[in-house]
């Protein structure tokens, strides 16, 4: 009976969160598709150059949201509602402060950021426009991530999913309207993206009006330990998102030297396509997180292990399905983002996908196990896994392998890195098994 209960709860949380994350990945793909159709290879290159800043904004939002919501879920399972509300208040304050910093950065420093990220020639103007608008919507991204995580951990994954899907599909519709009928170019693309968290927040506000939430704004004084607790748990989410931006930046630099802007556009096709699979893995991990944190809070080890087992099995099945889809439909997938029918871009994207996507089997496992460690307050293993796969191993691996095997070496760096980190993750789990 307990086993059925564990599986039922996991299926409910994970499936709803995966649906929401698929929606997010679809709007990222739609963004790339519409930009490719409307602005060609230069537009896709500008979009890819700006990704590190998006990763930073989304990463800090998840750091606050996941870190705060994990502590909130633990306190809630222990019946400590006042402590949970203090965590929420501190998280909200952090989101507002960081959002204001992003807004000011976008308003006054978008051009230096564009050039620092490697924008050159015809893509500088488009990258600057994209970054300016993206950063000025920073407060909404931070608040959306924070509220989404807290509401999901307060027992309402359905509303969390509804908000994510509504924001994502609104972005897809607005993308088309702004880029094509209204001919707003790259500004239209990022305006659609910026409005997405605004729309999502409108949906999430329903939760507050219903007055069913367990978290409230309270007077908070001398909350240094609360801030530390949020950051120590949430930094794993920040590193995950920020690392993806660092990897994109490093890969862009390497590929620019090997194959120019066309090579970067080919990498954009691969990176944006892989976002779908990674988003599903993240959805599984985030779906299991409230259950793991609550079980950890009351010391229910059977539930902890059951949720981890279901997460890993789900991840392996998804990885196999995605890889088979890539193997059989490589050409049409690459062609979707190659609106100018550039032969070299098509060839590089096809070759890269077949190699790059072998890493999914290991990356999914690493995402699941690092999230498991973070949700159960095992900070060192969680951060070590995330840092290794995020940039400490993959960036030098990409530089070394590109020297040895050119562009093929760049594509191989991802699966090789994820395999090594998966082996290390297993060692961490075995060493911590008696504590789990």
Name each model-derived stretch:
Residues 1-17, 72-137, 183-235, 292-358, ...:
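Short alpha-helical transmembrane segments in multi-pass integral membrane proteins
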Residues 2-39, 52-67, 71, 96-103, ...:
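N-terminal transmembrane alpha-helices
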Residues 12-31, 133, 144, 167, ...:
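Transmembrane helical elements of multi-pass membrane transporters/channels
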Residues 17, 21, 33, 70, ...:
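Transmembrane alpha-helix boundary and packing residues in multipass membrane permease domains
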Residues 26-45, 114-121, 177-184, 245-272, ...:
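Helix-terminus/linker motif at the lipid-water interface of multi-pass membrane proteins
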Residues 44-104, 141-160, 266-330, 363-382:
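Small-residue-rich hydrophobic transmembrane alpha-helices
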Residues 56-59, 171-175, 200-205, 275-279, ...:
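Hydrophobic transmembrane alpha-helices of multi-pass small-molecule transporters
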Residues 65, 133-152, 160-171, 189-204, ...:
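Short runs within selected transmembrane alpha-helices of multi-pass transporters and secretion channels
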């Amino acid at each position: 009976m307990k086993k059925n209960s564990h599986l039922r709860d996991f299926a409910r949380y994970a499936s709803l969160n995966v649906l929401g994350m698929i929606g997010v990945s679809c709007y990222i793909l739609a963004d790339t598709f519409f930009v490719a159709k409307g602005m060609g290879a230069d537009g896709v290159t500008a979009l890819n150059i700006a990704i590190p800043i998006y990763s930073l904004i989304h990463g800090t939002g998840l750091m606050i949201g996941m870190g705060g919501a994990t502590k909130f879920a633990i306190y809630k399972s222990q019946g400590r509602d006042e402590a949970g509300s203090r965590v929420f208040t501190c998280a909200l304050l952090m989101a507002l402060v960081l959002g204001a910093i992003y807004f000011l950065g976008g308003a006054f420093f978008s051009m230096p950021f564009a050039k620092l990220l490697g924008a050159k020639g015809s893509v500088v103007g488009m990258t600057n426009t994209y970054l300016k608008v993206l950063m000025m919507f920073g407060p909404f991204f931070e608040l959306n991530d924070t509220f989404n995580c807290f509401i999901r951990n307060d027992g309402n994954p359905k509303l969390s999913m509804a908000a994510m899907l509504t924001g994502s599909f609104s972005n897809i519709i607005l993308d088309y309207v702004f880029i094509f009928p209204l001919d707003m170019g790259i500004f239209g693309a990022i305006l659609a993206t910026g409005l997405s968290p605004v729309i999502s927040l409108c949906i999430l506000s329903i939760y507050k009006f219903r007055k069913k939430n367990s978290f409230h704004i309270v007077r908070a004084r001398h909350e240094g330990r609360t801030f530390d607790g949020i950051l120590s748990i949430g930094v794993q989410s920040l590193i995950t998102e920020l690392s993806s931006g660092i990897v994109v930046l490093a890969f862009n630099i390497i590929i620019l030297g090997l194959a120019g802007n066309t090579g970067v556009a080919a990498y954009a096709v691969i990176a944006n396509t892989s976002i779908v699979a990674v988003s599903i893995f993240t959805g599984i991990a985030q779906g299991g997180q409230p259950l793991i944190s609550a079980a950890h809070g009351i010391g229910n080890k059977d539930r902890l292990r059951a949720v981890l087992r279901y997460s890993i099995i789900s991840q392996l099945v998804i990885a196999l399905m995605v890889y088979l889809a890539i193997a059989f439909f490589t050409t049409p997938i690459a062609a979707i983002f190659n609106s100018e029918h550039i032969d070299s871009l098509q060839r590089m994207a096809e070759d890269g996908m077949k190699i790059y996507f072998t890493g999914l089997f290991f990356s999914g496992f690493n995402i699941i196990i690092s999230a498991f460690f973070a949700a159960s307050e095992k900070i060192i293993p969680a951060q070590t896994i995330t840092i290794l796969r995020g940039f400490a191993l993959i960036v030098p691996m990409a530089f070394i392998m590109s020297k040895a095997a050119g562009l093929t070496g760049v594509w191989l760096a991802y699966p090789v890195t994820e395999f090594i980190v998966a082996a290390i993750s297993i060692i961490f789990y075995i060493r911590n098994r008696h504590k789990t």
